[in-house]
Amino acid sequence: MEQYQAYLELRRSRYQDILYPLFFRESIYGLAYAHESFFIENVDYNNKFSLLIVKRLSTRMYQQTHFILFVNDSKKNTFVGYNYHFFSQIILEGFGIVVEILFSLQLFSSSLRGLEIVKSYKNFQSIHSIFPFFEDQLIYLNHKSDIRIPYPIHLEILVQILRYSIKDVSFFHLIRLFFYYYYNWNSLFPPKKWIFTFFSKRNRRIFLFLYNLYVWEYESIFLFLRNKSSQLQLKHFRVFFERIFFYEKIKHLVEVSTKNCSYTFFFFKDTFIHYVRYQGKSILVLKNTPFLINKWKYYFIYLWQCHFDIWAGLETIYINELSQYSFHFLGYFLSIPLNLSVVRSQMLQNSFLIKIVIKKLDTIVPIIPLMRSLAKTKFCNVMGHPISKPVWANLSDFDIIDRFLRICRNFSHYYNGSAKKKSFYQIKYILRFSCIKTLARKHKSTVRIYLKKLSSEKLLEEFFTEEDLFSLIFPRTSFTLRRFYRGRIWYLDILLRNDFVNYL
């Protein structure tokens, strides 16, 4: 227990005066100048949430002698003669900016030490980096746990988590004051999903910060338990650490193996745990016995209930065998089928038939959900037949073709890593004919007449390569095309999901 407390203390910072940058101009501009987003794009927010406006309003509040907040009657709340709701929203957004700057600077200074690590981290920012990792590791594992991360139903839990890192009493008094205004803090059971609607519509930046802080705290404890469950403890933990620090781990492995045992592979017989988080959910993939997997399940439940005071039932975590289970992940449909191969072995006068089971990760384009998303965006009907986009009919021909090509190109880059290309080409076919029907609608003509006037081959080449066309028409004609049909190309410069995936 003492080792666990010491571990958490090392990961937590101690900011004594969090309000200081808001009241003293010299400090806030230094922080704003040094602040850059190294990991994700900055969250968009309105220009009215500028630091200069926040500082001026904070100065007015600081100079105000009579400032009374009526908890039960928010209409009486005024701020320097103006509406309290507008100014409290701006100041609360300013708090989110300042705290985000401080924590991002701490994260950069503690996690990325040296230029080489920064370059390595940026090389694995792509959302597609997880799929080659799955291809390398997932086939050797046997169980998968779907974890739905519970969210605190009361704001006090989030504030208590924030108090672990910040020791500024005035900051918590003021942030509680704003929360009192938006909602009755004393209510024991707030409405369902109230926290999400409160933050996502009014204070998106402070919501993302508090949520990420809560997840960071939960994953820090999980990392501690994960390292303690393995005999070969990790020296570093970053995104895709298996690849970034591969050579350093090999050196460390050799040192450990020569001192403690005679067999190097002894360490690889221990627990294999891989963790991925996305969209408020997480995937825990293990190579373990059912007993140890259920043990991890109760670890998570007790962690949420005892440490965060959040109720989490057994239905929060589902455990499945990978060989008998398929799942959706980031717009792909993943499965690990068992391919049975029979090998004949000849030994002198006897021959033997040996059955070998080979696992392979299949990344399939979910054709039906994608057609539904295309139908919602008016590219096709419910049956999957292409239709025109009347909203774009008033644009020029160049703009119409450019928009469709951009959508088709983004779709191709995102789904080029699919194992089977037929569904992939069907979606591109829908986009192509939707473009042709939109152009024909604009020129008040039919598709056949419009294609006769326009060079159809040129438009066809814009949407498909030569291999695409042959694979769509003759999917299994030659060995070369069959190799292309099965090939996968992962684009490692994609930071966001495809737009169609948002509708899945």
UniProtKB/Swiss-Prot annotation:
Pfam families recorded: Intron_maturas2, MatK_N
Subcellular location: Plastid, Chloroplast
Listed GO MF terms: RNA binding
Keywords, in A-Z order: Chloroplast, mRNA processing, Plastid, RNA-binding, tRNA processing
Family annotation (InterPro entries): Domain_X, Maturase_MatK, Maturase_MatK_N
GO annotations of cellular component type: chloroplast
GO BP annotation list: mRNA processing; RNA splicing; tRNA processing
Protein family: Belongs to the intron maturase 2 family. MatK subfamily.
Cited function: Usually encoded in the trnK tRNA gene intron. Probably assists in splicing its own and other chloroplast group II introns.
HAMAP family tied to this protein: MatK (MF_01390)
Record protein name field: Maturase K
